[in-house]
């Protein structure tokens, strides 16, 4: 069974939030912490996991991500 994760990460002072979806949360958090992906999270140094929700359906995960945004 596949697992998908909706997650929220923030910066050191909790001023900036990023909401995303992934099928590998450990890899994705590692990428954010080590600034391996150019974009919003690298620019704003967003890396601290503050919320995690697991789902079995990718469409449901994407829908939840949009709801949170």
Label each PLM-derived region with a short phrase.
Residues 1-38, 42-69:
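GIY-YIG nuclease catalytic motif and its immediate N-terminal context
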């Amino acid at each position: 069974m596949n697992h998908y994760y909706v997650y929220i990460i923030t910066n050191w002072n909790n001023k900036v939030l990023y909401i995303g979806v992934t099928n590998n949360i450990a890899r994705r958090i590692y990428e954010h912490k080590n600034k391996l992906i150019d974009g919003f999270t690298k620019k704003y140094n967003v890396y601290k996991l503050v919320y995690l929700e697991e789902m079995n359906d990718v469409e449901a995960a994407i829908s939840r991500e949009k709801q949170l945004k």
